[in-house]
């Protein structure tokens, strides 16, 4: 059974190199975990893929440790309980800051350099003519006052921070401009389910979660808007891993090739086609957006 670290917070991928005691003292373990941004089934598949692939590539034991939420993932890497983590853009910045400069982004999926959020609406609401596909959030603004709306997790880049940023820029008040005020779900899967089931009229979520959903689910949750692009998920490594180990981990990700059968489980688990090397400076725009929302009193 995989261990679960419970700390009041959201989810993401993390890993730490820990020396074992006793007979296993010379057999270090790379402990890995991640933000729970999707369903438990998807996180379990990710855990199995990481343990298997990184274990073989690095020639060592790899253990995936579940984090109960996003904050727990950030707390683990910040307190040196793990050394490597797969984060969203916002939690990635949080993770680097939590390590007081002793951590950096080392890899990202190629598509994360051009990521986006989808706004979706319940089929019945669309069929009733209350909302439909729009070319801008300004066009969506007058319709939202009579509709319920949900974001994803509070620290989700694609499920909350960036869509809130774009909605604010369009002049949408997330309290008075939405029926009942904007709500939040724990992850993207829950957002999609809530909208598809009609428990919420409109929602914002990670586009890959929507694109990968069943046709039946997408029939009940209609895509009505696609945001401009931004940078998102990233692999963050603590400097305590050492340059040699960090280079090996980075290479293990950037060498993943969809044409190789042995790499498909890993790529599928990450919903990725390719990984590329990354630098922390690429996430400056995320820092700027977070600061802007904080300055406006919309984010703590």
Name every feature range the model reports, one short phrase each.
Residues 17-19:
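C-terminal motif of bacterial Sec signal peptides marking the signal peptidase cleavage site
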Residues 27-47:
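Extracytoplasmic "Venus flytrap"
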Residues 35-36, 109-118, 215-253, 257, ...:
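Periplasmic-binding protein-like
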Residues 86-100, 168-169, 193-220, 229:
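A ligand-binding cleft/hinge motif common to bilobed small-molecule-binding domains
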